[in-house]
């Protein structure tokens, strides 16, 4: 407009006014030609060229998982942690299978020991036989004129499941013998301080000399042979005689005065006048009591084992009859008696 005023033409060329965007102020803010429309124009766009592409660094290799311990360490599960019931059942099944295998292994070992024992017994019989087998009990020195009377080997002759029972009965017999020996010394000590107790001292010597061999022969050996050969007859002999022996064990523990037993009653009678002798007698009474209790327990235990073996009174009768008729002396005596009876019958008028 200022230019028009200078030229003096109030009506400038219409071509200059046809395009209103020719104004310099508008041209200055016109967008560049690289954008076709205003819709794609971004005034905040960075016109600098993008940086060159760099490939990402490779990720580090994952570490190998730690080896699981052979036994899973016990830990307390959190309340929100789910329980692994599947693994528990698997572990329980594995534990049950392991226990079953161990049980079968123990049974196989027991059978192997039994077979080994039988094999050694057969070898022993094949080499010398039962007739030439040397007796080893009682274990006497070689220079002693009295030789052993019995052969005893619990590990070889007794089955594996009964060896502990037979060994316990053998120790019971040894303890009863020791108690009778101590009872003899206690009665001797009392006789030394009281000469009026001579009858008790004499009976204590008799019990020592009588019960020691008789108990071994009458109830221990039948019990040993019963378990060795599963003999019902020997079981019945043992039950009868050992029951009587248990009664004597109880009487020994009671200690009736004048019977030759240093039991509780006799020890309490002496405790007031002879304290030193009473102490020894109380120890013997305590030993008698323990033997009586153990004897009753073992009698009940052996009876339960006897019932498990399938033995019976009929079987005992059959064994007794077979043993009697297989004895050469019995057969000879029976034949002589029959021949004598027949001869007398023919001679009778």
UniProtKB/Swiss-Prot annotation:
Modified residues (Phosphothreonine): 37
Keyword line: Isopeptide bond, Membrane, Phosphoprotein, Protein transport, Transmembrane, Transmembrane helix, Transport, Ubl conjugation
Location relative to the cell: Membrane
Ranges of compositional bias, category Pro residues: 49-68
Cross-link (Glycyl lysine isopeptide (Lys-Gly) (interchain with G-Cter in SUMO1)): 315
InterPro entries registered for this protein in UniProt: SCAMP
Residues with PTM Phosphoserine: 32, 74, 78, 87
Membrane topology: Multi-pass membrane protein
Keyword DNA damage: no
Listed transmembrane segments: 169-189, 200-220, 236-256, 277-297
Posttranslational mods: Monoubiquitinated.
Residues in compartment: Cytoplasmic: 1-168, 298-349
GO CC, one annotated term: Golgi membrane
Any Pfam family hit: SCAMP
List of residues that carry Phosphotyrosine: 41, 53, 85
One annotated GO biological process: response to retinoic acid
Predominant place of localization: membrane
Disordered as annotated region, ranges: 1-90
Subunit comment: Interacts with NEDD4 and NEDD4L and TSG101. Interacts with RNF126.
The family this protein is said to belong to: Belongs to the SCAMP family.
Summary of the function given for this chain in its UniProt record: Functions in post-Golgi recycling pathways. Acts as a recycling carrier to the cell surface.
Protein name, per record: Secretory carrier-associated membrane protein 3
